[in-house]
């Protein structure tokens, strides 16, 4: 097994991370790790974290899980266009460090807990990011 430091080092060298998990993955914290390492991610739409972390064409690419041709096209685009690869990697890093970080999660958890203890409606506290409402997603949430 690799140490967390070794994993991080490999991700930072990789440039691109393929997140091909399906609905059995749950959240898939490795996506957070890859984005925090500055990888341009290509993520399947069926994994739990994808709709919350990856904005297709802005901070990564999303493909329909199981569509190998679409996965190939998204990866090929990043390989053929290093500037887009770098831009996605930088935007992914900013997504994690700017919003989906431990400090924000801890602060929001405390605010959420206090709201619940006070009997207030906590569903409107945060529009996105940690502790925001996560409604059920339809299987076809991602459209090309």
Regions found by a protein language model. Name each.
Residues 56-57, 61-68, 77-82:
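Conserved acidic donor-binding segment of nucleotide-sugar-dependent glycosyltransferases
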Residues 70, 77, 84-98, 105-111, ...:
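A short, well-ordered alpha-helix in the C-terminal region of glycosyltransferases
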Residues 98, 103-144:
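C-terminal amphipathic helix plus adjacent low-complexity
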